[in-house]
Amino acid sequence: MKSKQILTEKSKQTPKSTPKLIIITGVPCSGKSSVSREILKNFKAMYIDKDMINDGFTLERESQFYQKIREGTYKAIDNIAGENLLYGNNVLIDGTFSTEIQNKKWFDRYAKLAKDTRSDLRLIRCIAPQELIKRRLKQRGFDKDKPKLKAFDEFLDREPIIVKWIGQLEIDTSKDFKKNIKDILKFIN
């Protein structure tokens, strides 16, 4: 059965409550995954981590192959999220979306997905001072982070911490973690 058929059939059903499409964005080591894990302790949602999907194909982040994987990953995320929302499940997506968040078309795509699945969209961006991000990258010690650390200034040029943000909530993860989570949970609900 195709997704459009499912959408038509499922849209006739009324879920008990409106599902939430929650997207957590931010540069690597901005605190997205820590925030996501804590939210999931307090809010039931299907969890999609972009890096888990990408890393199954490649750890390389600079090649044309990665760009193709990235595009396919985003399509897969959209499909998985859409199907789950149609079944009334909350969905939390954890992904950098570093260039995408500056593009209104990206926002419009998720706004349309939320509308088509009768869900509420919640966009959250994690930020932190660049010194903290650099320290977190070093502490994390992933091979995929070595090029970022080697050319940290160029990395920040490609993936700036502060951008023109078209989302809804921005959280500084260098601040009080418990308060941030409390604010996010209030925003989500």
Which residues does each PLM region occupy?
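Small-molecule kinase domains that catalyze NTP-dependent phosphoryl transfer to phosphate-bearing small molecules
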Residues: 139-183
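Extreme N-terminal, non-catalytic leader segments
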Residues: 1-19
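Conserved substrate/cofactor phosphate-moiety recognition/catalytic segment
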Residues: 34-86
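Conserved glycine(s) of the Walker
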Residues: 31
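Hydrophobic anchor at the beta1->P-loop junction of P-loop NTPases
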Residues: 24
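Conserved phosphate-donor/acceptor-positioning beta-strand/loop module used by diverse small-molecule
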Residues: 115-137
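The conserved Walker
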Residues: 28
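Glycine-rich phosphate-binding loop used to anchor ATP phosphates in small-molecule kinases
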Residues: 72-117
